[in-house]
UniProtKB/Swiss-Prot annotation:
HAMAP family: FlgI. The lineage of its organism: Bacteria, Pseudomonadati, Pseudomonadota, Alphaproteobacteria, Hyphomicrobiales. It is found in: Periplasm; Bacterial flagellum basal body. Pfam families: FlgI. Its main location: periplasm. GO terms for biological process: bacterial-type flagellum-dependent cell motility. It comes from Rhodopseudomonas palustris (strain HaA2). This is Flagellar P-ring protein. Assembles around the rod to form the L-ring and probably protects the motor/basal body from shearing forces during rotation. GO terms for molecular function: structural molecule activity. The basal body constitutes a major portion of the flagellar organelle and consists of four rings (L,P,S, and M) mounted on a central rod. It comes from the Bacteria.
Length: 373
């Protein structure tokens, strides 16, 4: 008869196994909330022009940046200080652009974050304060007003013969630095229907979302319009209460589908491949041809009293080396992991892998779309 401790261990192992399996199953599905947005519910970009003051001599050079000088004069005149014709010498002011995103359903009096970026030749915005800056939308209306002290992620220090910079000291952020003054009207509760806009357009995913909604409601209220849009007719029991309807729909679980795709960033050498990438039978060989040229000119210096001249004789050395690589056979239908393991076995780096993947695609042996960024 097994001991009590053995039984407890078996029960614990079974519970852990069930937990792991449930985690795998949960990872296979996602909430509709994570797959799609409600059409019309979005952020709006705001932008404004302003001045940052209080800089420790790291602001704009007024003689080189005329718009900073003009803005400073206009601001002081609005405050009753007339400096027309006077010589202004200060390095504590910088012209900046202020940007931010107006959240959906934002109400008057709430706050939002803003980003402040130098527009002139300011070296550092550290320690600066943004003066009152109206933030405009694309329609030209003022939706928020920003002001506050900047938080800078980088820094710059310099001496007479050296300078060091970390990060970007000419860009800062003000948390909750803008107050919203105008709301954007969006009467969600009065809509007879809402549309779901998929973040990643896909026919299969759109159909699955519609099926999940219809199964939940027991009616044909959802219809996929195209790969990126699912139209939802609000049922009678939710009329005038679209918020409750959307809340219920967002929590439904759907298994998303996606096309096999390979993303390549040639600038950084980053390669990202989806799990559904498959490769047909193909042979791969890769070799690097390196040509190196070194110049070591020889200088003939005559005796100072010989009345001769200095002669420079060029001396070039050219070397060619080629890395011998084996021919690798990639079998039909291999998975992503097998493909990566096989190419790594050839000693291929990320940048060489970019060319190989493009060549395999050109040969018609790779079952995926390649997107080069």
């Amino acid at each position: 008869m097994p001991s009590v401790s053995a039984v407890i261990l078996k029960l614990a192992a079974a519970a852990l196994s069930a937990l792991l399996l449930s985690g795998v199953a949960a990872n296979a599905t996602s909430r509709i909330k994570d797959l799609a947005n409600i059409e019309g519910v979005r952020q709006n970009q705001l932008i404004g022009y302003g001045l940052v003051v209080g800089l420790n001599g790291t602001g704009d050079t007024l003689n080189n940046i005329p718009f900073t000088k003009q803005s400073l004069q206009a601001m002081l005149e609005r405050m009753g200080v007339n400096i027309r014709g006077a010589t202004i010498r200060t390095g504590n002011v910088a012209a900046v652009m202020v940007t931010g995103n107006l959240p959906a359903f934002a109400t008057q009096g709430t706050r939002m974050d803003v980003t402040v970026s130098a527009l002139g030749d300011a070296k550092n915005l550290q320690g600066g304060t943004l003066l009152v800056t109206p933030l405009l939308g694309a329609d030209g209306n003022v939706y928020a007003v920003a002001q506050g002290s900047l938080a800078i992620g980088g820094f710059q220090a310099e001496g007479e013969a050296a300078k060091i910079t970390r990060g970007v000291p000419t860009v800062g952020r003000i948390a909750n630095g803008a107050i919203i003054e105008r709301e954007i009207e969006f009467a969600l509760n009065r809509l007879p229907m809402v549309r779901l806009a998929l973040r990643n357009a896909d026919f299969t995913t759109a159909k699955r979302i519609a099926a999940a909604v219809n199964d939940f409601l027991g009616t044909k209220s959802a219809e996929p319009i195209d790969p990126s849009t699912v139209q939802l007719t609000i049922p009678a029991e939710f009329k005038g209460n679209a918020v409750a309807f959307v809340t219920e729909i967002e929590q439904l679980q759907v298994e998303p589908d996606q096309a096999a795709k390979i993303i390549i960033d040639e600038r950084s050498g980053i390669i990202v491949m989806g799990r559904d990438v498959r490769v047909a039978t193909v042979a791969v060989a890769q070799g690097n041809l390196t040509v190196s040229i070194s110049e070591s000119p020889q200088v003939s210096q005559p005796n100072p009293l010989a009345n001769g001249r200095t002669v420079v004789t060029p001396n070039s050395r050219i070397g060619v080396t080629e890395d011998g690589k084996k021919l690798a056979l990639v079998k039909d239908g291999v998975s992503l992991q097998q493909l990566v393991d096989g190419l790594n076995g050839l000693g291929i780096g990320p940048r060489d892998l970019i060319g190989i993947l493009q060549a395999i695609k050109a040969a018609g042996a790779i079952e995926a779309d390649i997107e080069v960024m």
